[in-house]
A protein has these predicted regions:
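Elongated, amphipathic alpha-helical interaction scaffolds
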Residues: 1-296
Length: 296
C-alpha cells in the first residue's frame, strides 16, 4: 500500500453520505458486488448485473436529519435491494426496516400490472448501535409457515448487521496486529472495514483481499473531496441538531414532571414522526393536539 495513504484524514464509513459515496456510485459496483455476496450470501457473478437506482447525492436534502441516504440496487433477475446505514437508534428500527422493505414490493407494480412481475426484495440495515440483546451481530428474517417452517416461495428478507457488536473485541484493542484474519468470515471482515476506522485494520484487510484495497481507495478519494467534506459536515450538523432536540425534549419532560411528555416523544420517534418534536417542544398548543391524538 502506498505510504501517502496514511496522510489523509479518512471520513467515517459509518456516515450514510460517506457510505453512499464509497459503495453507491457507478464506479463502486465491483466493490458492491463483493459486499452483497459476502454479507447477504448472494451469488452475483458480475458487476454488470447490478443497476444502481439512486446514485445521486442531492445536497439540498442533507440538512434534513430525517431524509434517507440509502443505496438502492436492482439485479439482472429484477431482485431489489435497499441498503441503509443507521447511526442513531430512534427506537423504531424494526418497524422502519419492515416499512421500507415492503415499499420495495409495492413500488414494483403499477395499476393493471400482473402480480407475477413482483421480484424478490432484500432490506439490509447496517446499524451502529445494538438492536438485539444477544451476541449475534447478523440476523435475517424471512416469511415462513408457522407449523412446517417452510419458507415462503417469494423472497422477502430483512437483515440486520449490528456493526458495533461485530467489532467490539477487535476494533477497540490497540493490539490490532495480533489478530488473524484467517479466523474471520468475509462478513466479519466487512464489519471491521466499515466500523473500525483503524489504519492497521485497513492494512491487514488490504493484504487479504484486493476488494478492500479498491474500497479503501474510494474512501481516500471521498475523504479528499472538498465538496463531499462540506456535505458531510452539513449532514453531521443536522444529526447533532436532531440529538440536541431529542435531549431537550427529554429534559423538558423531566423538568415538567410529566411522564406523558416523554411518552409523547417516544411515540413520535416510534412512528417516524421525530421531525415534529421540535415544534412540540416550542408550541404548547401543538403539543396538546398531539396528546389528544395519541390519547396520552
Amino acid at each position: 500500500m502506498n505510504d501517502n495513504l496514511e496522510t489523509v484524514q479518512l471520513l467515517p464509513l459509518t456516515s450514510d453520505i460517506v457510505f453512499k459515496q464509497v459503495f453507491g456510485q457507478e464506479e463502486s459496483k465491483p466493490i458492491l458486488r463483493v459486499f452483497l455476496n459476502d454479507v447477504l450470501g448472494l451469488d452475483i457473478q458480475s458487476s454488470e448485473q447490478i443497476t444502481l437506482l439512486n446514485p445521486i447525492i442531492d445536497p439540498k436534502y442533507l440538512d434534513d436529519k430525517m431524509c434517507i441516504l440509502d443505496v438502492r440496487v436492482q439485479l439482472s433477475d429484477r431482485s431489489l435491494i435497499d441498503i441503509e446505514i443507521q447511526v442513531l437508534n430512534r427506537h423504531n428500527m424494526e418497524k422502519r426496516a419492515l416499512y421500507y422493505t415492503c415499499q420495495l414490493c409495492t413500488e414494483q407494480l403499477h395499476t393493471g400490472d400482473d402480480y407475477s412481475k413482483t421480484a424478490p426484495v432484500y432490506g439490509l440495515n447496517l446499524l451502529c448501535f445494538d438492536l438485539y440483546k444477544d451476541s449475534r451481530y447478523y440476523r435475517s428474517f424471512v416469511l415462513k409457515d408457522e407449523e412446517t417452517n417452510e419458507t415462503y416461495r417469494q423472497t422477502f428478507k430483512i437483515s440486520f448487521f449490528e456493526l458495533r457488536k461485530a467489532v467490539s473485541e477487535l476494533s477497540q484493542t490497540k493490539e490490532v496486529e495480533t489478530f488473524e484474519l484467517s479466523g474471520l468470515t468475509a462478513r466479519d471482515q466487512w464489519a471491521l472495514f466499515i466500523n473500525s476506522g483503524q489504519q492497521e485494520v485497513y492494512e491487514k484487510l488490504i493484504e487479504e483481499n484486493k476488494t478492500f484495497e479498491e474500497a479503501y481507495e474510494r474512501l481516500k478519494k471521498a475523504s479528499s473531496d472538498e465538496t463531499l467534506m462540506a456535505m458531510y459536515r452539513n449532514r453531521e450538523k443536522a444529526i447533532r441538531d436532531w440529538n440536541d432536540s431529542i435531549t431537550s425534549a427529554r429534559k423538558d419532560g423531566v423538568q415538567q414532571g410529566e411522564q406523558r411528555v416523554n411518552m409523547l416523544y417516544e411515540r413520535l420517534l416510534q412512528e417516524n414522526r421525530g421531525s415534529e418534536i421540535p415544534k412540540a417542544i416550542a408550541d404548547p398548543a401543538f403539543r396538546t393536539k398531539l396528546f389528544n391524538e395519541y390519547g396520552i
